[in-house]
From Swiss-Prot:
Transmembrane segments: none annotated. One of its GO terms (molecular function) is peptidase activity. GO terms for biological process: proteolysis; tRNA modification. InterPro entries: Peptidase_U32, Peptidase_U32_C, RNA/ubiquinone_mod_enzymes. It is an enzyme of class 3 (hydrolase). It comes from Bacillus subtilis (strain 168). This is tRNA hydroxylation protein P1. The gene is trhP1. Belongs to the peptidase U32 family. Its EC number is 3.4.-.-. Disruption phenotype: Deletion mutant lacking both trhP1 and trhP2 shows reduced 5-methoxyuridine (mo5U) formation in tRNAs.
Amino acid sequence: MTAVNDKISTIVNGKRVITKKPELLAPAGNLEKLKIAVHYGADAVFIGGQEYGLRSNADNFTIEEIAEGVEFAKKYGAKIYVTTNIFAHNENMDGLEDYLKALGDANVAGIIVADPLIIETCRRVAPNVEVHLSTQQSLSNWKAVQFWKEEGLDRVVLARETSALEIREMKEKVDIEIESFIHGAMCIAYSGRCVLSNHMTARDSNRGGCCQSCRWDYDLYQTDGANAVALYGEEDAPFAMSPKDLKLIESIPKMIEMGIDSLKIEGRMKSIHYVATVVSVYRKVIDAYCADPENFVIQKEWLEELDKCANRDTATAFFEGTPGYEEQMFGEHAKKTTYDFVGLVLNYDEDTQMVTLQQRNFFKKGDEVEFFGPEIENFTHTIETIWDEDGNELDAARHPLQIVKFKLDKKIYPSNMMRKGK
């Protein structure tokens, strides 16, 4: 049973409701993903600029795109945070002040920082921008949280390795905003402090170049002089060093009652289908619990929905304590994705019942597809006829980003998505 926190709730018409609803924080690797995240229910979005972030392989944002994203988010009451969480070397100092000033001028709500140099510089040149301490600082005790509060930071992003008991003590002893991960990839290294990528590919993982070496397939040998004995691999399936992905959907009630301020989804390099699916599910969970915590139950369809965009097994990692063997991913990878994202709705004409769709994966006549979006309940439909933009009939939508049309007798909306089972 979840412990009740009276500081975050009130009684309305004889029923307890949560008044301190946590922020739902979503990832976005480009402007399209940012807009999708906000449209599907994110309260805030974290993005990376083209410098000083840890995901150089994401599309990332120009200053102009950041400003556009901020203006878009503002219309929906959402915030934008920018990652500037590299561990800076001397050559990274050139241009830092100008970059942080530009972020301030773009009216971003906050920056996510690991390096004290960047913290000090931001507070000096962009004083209106909140400073959030990155998970790269590996905070896992309340004294460290207290230290950074005294340094003037507005929020701390906890290490993924922090347990529920440790987080509870932090909230009780330190008055500062706490952000905690709820969904996404885990790292074999402590909060991302890893140099495997540096050694294996000459890409600095702490300056945006991580190639996810821990997810490669490995064989393990024990050597004794000239002899090598395979301990794992060869006839067995190769193993990966990386743990299972994080999924804390069933722990959301506990996290809300603990007073955690921001619940964070990982995945700036993930697809818009991933962003839309995961954000929409956690939006429903948070809203449902806050509206009626006493009668809250995790719905089966929420769990099934998350599985539609997952390609790895999941676990609760460190939140409920030290993970055991079952939390790790050894042996053959379990590919769990059950659906392909095949199209983004651009328009729906109610008079003609015609859908205009941008193709994102192959589909054909006769396919059973599923539609989902924040304005609709999920439903399935069988594709009967497909036309191109010029009205020519097609047997399939074969080309990436091709604009196609087809009939649908249920109303849908722009930015709704279409997917099909594998």
